[in-house]
């Protein structure tokens, strides 16, 4: 029932009352009727406002139907947590050179800054891939010498021995020469340093073996840790 209808009913009720001479009793009745009419109109108006603004009555479901925003936020959080957990389970290896051996490049998986995790293995100086997938392969060496009594050519190579074929295939390779020409006899022999860094992404198979080698290990500089290393990271 609308507010206008309720007011109209009150007015009709007042007109239907018998018109009598105004006296003390009739004045009291009119006052009570007026007060009742006012309270009725005020209550109806308040009820209409509460219903119109949704304070009472059935709630509007269009604000968050089925709690989709909350569920979506929770799903996104769970996805991010799952993604970070999966990243920590991926195979990874970082091996360093053994500085205690002379004129050879031997990799160590134990010690400072060395790491083998989640299935990676170091066997016969080669890193063994534990599962199929994309891998970041990288390696760095640092050569050091004193003068150039002869022409020096330095190479650094990362090779793959695949399960599907036994041939050795070079994945990464670089060649450098610190001495473009020989140092004349009697001249001052100046020290030289030559770093080589290799890196790339490759599709590898389970059981593949990777090696990192140099042609002249006698020139390797093991004076500082972190100068010669070899690593693989699953993507």
UniProtKB/Swiss-Prot annotation:
Gene behind this protein: TNF
Localization (cell): Cell membrane
SUPFAM superfamilies, per database record: TNF-like
Record-marked site positions (Cleavage): 34-35, 39-40, 49-52, 79-80
Transmembrane segments: 36-56
Protein name (Swiss-Prot/TrEMBL): Tumor necrosis factor
Alphabetically ordered keywords of this record: Cell membrane, Cytokine, Disulfide bond, Glycoprotein, Lipoprotein, Membrane, Myristate, Phosphoprotein, Secreted, Signal-anchor, Transmembrane, Transmembrane helix
Any GO molecular function: cytokine activity
Main location, first listed in the record: membrane
Topology in membrane: Single-pass type II membrane protein
Disulphide bonds in the chain: 148-179
Residues carrying a glycan: 83, 86
GO cellular component, one term: cell surface
Cytoplasmic face residues: 1-35
Entry keyword Lipoprotein: yes
Annotated source species: Peromyscus leucopus (White-footed mouse)
PROSITE patterns assigned: THD_1, THD_2
Subunit: Homotrimer. Interacts with SPPL2B.
InterPro entries the UniProt entry points to: TNF, TNF_alpha, TNF_CS, TNF_dom, Tumour_necrosis_fac-like_dom
Alphabetical GO biological process terms: extrinsic apoptotic signaling pathway via death domain receptors; immune response; necroptotic signaling pathway; positive regulation of canonical NF-kappaB signal transduction; positive regulation of extrinsic apoptotic signaling pathway; positive regulation of NF-kappaB transcription factor activity; positive regulation of transcription by RNA polymerase II; regulation of biological quality
Signal sequence, start to end: none
Function: Cytokine that binds to TNFRSF1A/TNFR1 and TNFRSF1B/TNFBR. It is mainly secreted by macrophages and can induce cell death of certain tumor cell lines. It is potent pyrogen causing fever by direct action or by stimulation of interleukin-1 secretion and is implicated in the induction of cachexia, Under certain conditions it can stimulate cell proliferation and induce cell differentiation. Induces insulin resistance in adipocytes via inhibition of insulin-induced IRS1 tyrosine phosphorylation and insulin-induced glucose uptake. The TNF intracellular domain (ICD) form induces IL12 production in dendritic cells.
Stretches in topological domain Extracellular: 57-235
């Amino acid at each position: 029932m609308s507010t206008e209808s309720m007011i109209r009913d009150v007015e009709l009720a007042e007109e239907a009352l018998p018109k009598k001479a105004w006296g003390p009793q009739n004045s009291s009745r009119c006052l009570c009727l007026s007060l009742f009419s006012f309270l009725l109109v005020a209550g109806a108006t308040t009820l209409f406002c509460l219903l119109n603004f949704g304070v009472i009555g059935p709630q509007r479901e269009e604000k968050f139907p089925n709690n989709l925003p909350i569920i979506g936020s929770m799903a996104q959080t769970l996805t991010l947590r799952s993604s970070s957990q999966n990243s920590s389970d991926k195979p990874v290896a970082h091996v360093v050179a053994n500085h205690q051996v002379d004129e050879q490049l031997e990799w160590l998986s134990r010690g400072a800054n060395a790491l083998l995790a989640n299935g990676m293995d170091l066997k016969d100086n080669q890193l063994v891939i534990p599962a199929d997938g994309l891998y970041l392969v990288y390696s760095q060496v640092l050569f050091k010498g004193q003068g150039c009594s002869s022409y020096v050519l330095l190479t650094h190579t990362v090779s793959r021995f695949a399960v599907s074929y036994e041939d050795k295939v070079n994945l990464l390779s670089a060649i450098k020469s610190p001495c473009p020409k020989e140092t004349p006899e009697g001249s001052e022999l100046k020290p030289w340093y030559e770093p080589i860094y290799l890196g790339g992404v490759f599709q590898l198979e389970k059981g593949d073996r990777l090696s990192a080698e140099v042609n002249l290990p006698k020139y390797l500089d093991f004076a500082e840790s972190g100068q010669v290393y070899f690593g693989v990271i699953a993507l």
